Amino acid sequence: MDQKVNDDEIDLRALIAVLLNHWKLILSMLLLGLLGGIYYAQSATPIYKTNSLIQVDKKSSGVSALGADVADLLNAQDGSAQTEVEIINSRMILWPVINQLHLDLNVNQLKDSFLDKLLIKKNVLVSHTENGVGNLKVGLWIAEFNVPLAYQNKNFVLTAIDSQNFKLISPDGAEFTGKVATASRFKTSAGNIDIQVTSLAPGYSYNLSKLTPAKAIENLRKNLAVAEKGKQTGILDASLTGANQDEITHTLTRIVKMYETQNLDKSSAETTKTLASVSYTHLTL
């Protein structure tokens, strides 16, 4: 019995000795874990989801209104909810919305360091609107950015030289300089690059890319889901996910409106009715 107590005491003393001898390593690991947790919490972007319900009148169909040949091509019956799902996901509906809201322009902050993510509470989101892309809270706004086909889907680097001037570096390394709040045109062998930067705070650099219509539509479809709610209900549930709450709500509203407009233009004013919209859910961190 005494021998067992002594063994326990020896084990306890050995454990304390190990802790004392390696306290620096243990403390370092604890601090590293703490910093890693803070980094993830600060840099992780929350994802939101917005929904809109659309009632489809079974007496008419957006596809049938476009002509019998199109309806036959899609092998769809009048009033088919699945047919309307395909219409909403079509280029005819999505591309005008992308064009209106500049969703074919990607803007991402360059060299977002570990220290920046650790110290800044949350990254400020870039918004896509009818007037351009950016976020005035960080002094960034791009009203226009158009590039030749050879440069589409490729990254440019935009850097503020000072509060009045900027530098744009093309994917092949060519450098151009322009003035903030002034439309600029840069000539290249592939064609003209048009850009208008209305606001750009010094000290920041950004990756810019102008997407092809096909790529922009593909990106939007990845976040857009449309399906019939229930079976043969004639009600479609459209949802859009993204990091910017206001933007996804505005974008989905535009998609629904564009769908309704197409039906109105084809003398199908009673085809759709928006039942509910601007509802969103916080999905993940």
Language model features with spans:
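Hydrophobic and amphipathic membrane-targeting/association helices
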Residues: M1-L283
